[in-house]
């Protein structure tokens, strides 16, 4: 595997995983809020 591929893909993978992490945290908070309001 060429090192240039790693250099190009690493920031994309990091950004994608960070976005998924933030979206999952927000979704869990919203689910908790919905459960407590019932």
Swiss-Prot record:
A GO term from the CC aspect: plasma membrane-derived thylakoid membrane
Disulfide bonds: none
Function statement: Loosely associated component of the core of photosystem II (PSII), it is not always seen in crystals. PSII is a light-driven water plastoquinone oxidoreductase, using light energy to abstract electrons from H(2)O, generating a proton gradient subsequently used for ATP formation.
Protein name: Photosystem II reaction center protein Y
InterPro entries: PSII_PsbY
Protein source organism: Picosynechococcus sp. (strain ATCC 27264 / PCC 7002 / PR-6) (Agmenellum quadruplicatum)
Single Gene Ontology MF annotation: manganese ion binding
Family: Belongs to the PsbY family.
Keywords, ordered alphabetically: Membrane, Photosynthesis, Photosystem II, Thylakoid, Transmembrane, Transmembrane helix
GO biological process per UniProt: photosynthesis
